[in-house]
Amino acid sequence: MAIPGRQYGLILPKKTQPLNRVLQKPSVFGNDSDDDEASVSESLQREAAKKQAMRQTKLEIQKALAEDSTVYEYDSIYDEMQKKKEENNPKLLMGKDRKPKYIHNLLKAVEIRKKEQEKRMEKKIQREREMEKGEFDDKEAFVTSAYKKKLEERAEEEEREKRAAALEARLDVTKQKDLSGFYRHLLNQAVGEEAVPKSSFREARTVIKEEKLRGYPDETNSENRPQQNCALQSGVEEAEENPDADSDSEESCDDGERGDHKVKSRGEEDTGASTKYLKHHKNHTHSRSSSEEGGLSTKYHSRSSQSRGHEHKGGQHQDRQSRDQESCHKDRSHREEKSSHRHREASHKDHHWKRHEHEDKPKGRGQGERQDREWKREKYSSREQEKDRQWNDHDRYSEKEKKGKEKEEHRKARRERCEDGAKYRERKKPEGSGQSSERHRDRRESSPRPRPEDDLLDQERSSKARNTEKDKGEQGKPPRSETSLATKHRLTEERPEKGSQPERPPEAVSKFAKRSNEETVMSARDRYLARQMARINAKTYIEKEDD
């Protein structure tokens, strides 16, 4: 370093107070020669002082350079300081490294336009030469080396453009006539001349596996997702090394997830699955009932419009019975699938518990943990049994509701058929017909089979009479066999009486009106008797009753 008392570099002068110079009075008797001698001596002294100062400064500079060689390198030190500032300030670096966005594209476009302009000029010169028709062919043509070089560059550019166009035509699918290019790429990849693309079948399969794991409701929660992703990545690496080990890695991942899962999450999953299944079942039954109602309404409409063709009605009834049978088969198969699904879940969970016990034995865990697991298993099995009981109750209740709906629909259809028959008979009956009761009786006896409309009316009346008798009291009620014989006799007696009385149209009953207790059949035996009466009335011949 420099001497501590010395100061090197840029030294700013300090402000000093001006000295009061003492002016010497010139002597009156002085000579000019004295003045000249004084001025010479002063100049010599001044020069000597300057030389002394120069010598002193040189010595000081030499000493400073000997101590530190970079004392007077002001420019290099300043440049280093500026570089440090730029390095510390990232904005300045970003400003320097930033490249223009559009100028390089503009420059390329300018070059392309220049080449096109040169081509146009060449074509123009060529046309002028053709117009001259060989007038100046004998003259000597002066061609510079720069022009020759330009012509060579132009020829190379044209050759490059032709090659690029041919390659594009070869790779373009719309310009290819066959699959030769595709097969050529396949061959090159098989031989090894071309690199196989990254998106291979193996990577696509791993992506599909990951999506499958995300889709199911019995997966782990979002807390266990990172562990699952790590296991997936390790499984993918093992699959790449050994392609046959995909299934093994999947099974190990599933085992780890199941082992880490807690009993609480299991219960939540079971409740979620049960609620989802209930919603699905409700939607299924609702859609089925709505479709059945729609089918029944259309069926009844067609039946009322086509009431004249009784054979057509019989065919529709058979179709309806076949559809009901199909729906019953579908419901039975659906219930069987549900029960099998529940049994499968229970067996899967039992297998899960057994596997846990089998893993705990070789690890040598304590007896307390095994007892806790057995207690949890018993609790879980009791919960499963309760859930199965609830499912069975729900299925039984839905079957009862369905049967009740079918019975009500059957009764509505029968009542509408009766009304349609009465309207049809009223329409067909001629106005002012004074036919006697004897003619009616003769026609009835001569006809091979009774009219189905009359039979339906008789059936309705008999059911009403039976209900009224039942309401009166069961104390003086005769046995059921006697009542059935009495109702048969009454029906046979009412038939001839019906011909004598003028028929009155039945009152139109609204479909949505509430039925009274007289119209409802109370017991299974009454329903059986009603069916027997309907069968007897529908027969084409009259059976002789055995007294």
UniProtKB/Swiss-Prot annotation:
Main location, first listed in the record: nucleus
Segments of skewed composition (Acidic residues): 237-254
Residues that bear Phosphoserine: 27, 33, 247, 252, 447
Residues carrying N6-acetyllysine: 276
Pfam families for the chain: NRP1_C, NSRP1_N
Annotated function: RNA-binding protein that mediates pre-mRNA alternative splicing regulation.
Protein name per its UniProtKB record: Nuclear speckle splicing regulatory protein 1
Domain of life the protein comes from: Eukaryota
Molecular function terms, GO-annotated: mRNA binding
Entry's family note: Belongs to the NSRP1 family.
Transmembrane segments annotated in the record for this chain: none
Native source species: Rattus norvegicus
Gene: Nsrp1
Assigned keywords, A-Z: Acetylation, Coiled coil, Isopeptide bond, mRNA processing, mRNA splicing, Nucleus, Phosphoprotein, RNA-binding, Ubl conjugation
